[in-house]
From Swiss-Prot:
<keyword id="KW-0449">Lipoprotein</keyword>
<dbReference type="InterPro" id="IPR007876">
    <property type="entry name" value="NeuraminylLac-bd_hemagglutn"/>
</dbReference>
<feature type="lipid moiety-binding region" description="N-palmitoyl cysteine">
    <location>
        <position position="28"/>
    </location>
</feature>
<keyword id="KW-0732">Signal</keyword>
<dbReference type="Pfam" id="PF05211">
    <property type="entry name" value="NLBH"/>
</dbReference>
<feature type="lipid moiety-binding region" description="S-diacylglycerol cysteine">
    <location>
        <position position="28"/>
    </location>
</feature>
<keyword id="KW-0564">Palmitate</keyword>
<dbReference type="InterPro" id="IPR038531">
    <property type="entry name" value="NeuraminylLac-bd_hemagglutn_sf"/>
</dbReference>
<feature type="region of interest" description="N-acetyl-neuraminyl-alpha(2,3)-lactose binding motif">
    <location>
        <begin position="134"/>
        <end position="139"/>
    </location>
</feature>
<keyword id="KW-0998">Cell outer membrane</keyword>
<keyword id="KW-0472">Membrane</keyword>
<dbReference type="GO" id="GO:0009279">
    <property type="term" value="C:cell outer membrane"/>
</dbReference>
<feature type="signal peptide">
    <location>
        <begin position="1"/>
        <end position="27"/>
    </location>
</feature>
<protein>
    <recommendedName>
        <fullName>Neuraminyllactose-binding hemagglutinin</fullName>
    </recommendedName>
</protein>
């Protein structure tokens, strides 16, 4: 009887230990490895040849861009800053002196800027990256003590949407002389991605042996690099000295009219 009591006590403790181990393991969240193999470079070199310098100044407003929620704030800031730098480089390559305006609003031009600026360039737009609904699938982890991974996955293709509109202004009057718009959904940019997140439940025993991979951030950076290059390529084609000098007559009339 005494031996039997010891056996029952041992079995009970073993059961408790096993239950505790299971509870501990079930409570562990699986590890997610986020890849970082792509750099956000946002590079572009003007394709057109440098032309003869003119004694004319162009006011360059800061871009007023909005971004989709999946684009990190630091990426937004770099995209905006690089846009300003590269458009400035394109305009300088076309022979213009560039005055950077620390605002995206034409109403913030100083009188001196209005007076000395031949033209002004303003940019607005929406930079959107979204999963292609036709080529994206979602798989949610089912709750369970044993085989639940505790990981939800979205796998598919990231595509661009939104637009960028560039407006050419006469600074003194603030009147628009011309504009052109780029539809980002027309760009042939497709980035495969796998986004992995923790499920609302902690997962089962198998979750302790599972490692999830998430390369969605790399896909976003790669897509932004390509979007940026496409936007700058279009800017390079449109913001030529030949095109910008074609506004000279209208710009002069508007400036003189405002000065009367």
């Amino acid at each position: 009887m005494k031996t039997n009591g010891h056996f029952k006590d041992f079995a009970w403790k073993k059961c408790l230990l096993g239950t505790s181990v299971v509870a501990l393991l079930v409570g562990c969240s699986p590890h997610i490895i986020e890849t970082n193999e792509v750099a956000l470079k946002l590079n572009y070199h003007p394709a057109s040849e440098k032309v003869q310098a003119l004694d004319e100044k162009i006011l360059l407003l800061k871009p007023a861009f909005q971004y989709s929620d999946n684009i990190a704030k630091e990426y937004e800031n770099k995209f905006k800053n690089q846009t300003t730098l590269k458009v400035e480089e394109i305009l300088q390559n076309q022979g213009y002196k560039v005055i950077n305006v620390d605002s995206s609003d034409k109403d913030d031009f100083s009188f001196a800027q209005k007076k000395e600026g031949y033209l002004a360039v303003a940019m607005i737009g929406e930079i959107v990256l979204r999963p292609d609904p036709k080529r994206t699938i979602q798989k949610k982890s089912e709750p369970g003590l044993l085989f639940s991974t505790g990981l939800d996955k979205m796998e598919g293709v990231l595509i661009p949407a939104g637009f960028v509109k560039v407006t050419i202004l006469e600074p003194m009057s603030g009147e628009s002389l011309d504009s052109f718009t780029m539809d980002l959904s027309e760009l042939d940019i497709q980035e495969k991605f796998l986004k992995t997140t923790h499920s609302s439940h902690s997962g089962g025993l198998v979750s302790t042996m599972v490692k999830g991979t998430d390369n969605s951030n790399d896909a976003i950076k790669s897509a932004l690099n390509k979007i940026f290059a496409s936007i700058m390529q279009e800017m390079d084609k449109k913001l030529t000295q030949r095109n910008l000098e074609s506004y000279q007559k209208d710009a002069k009339e508007l400036k003189n009219k405002r000065n009367r």
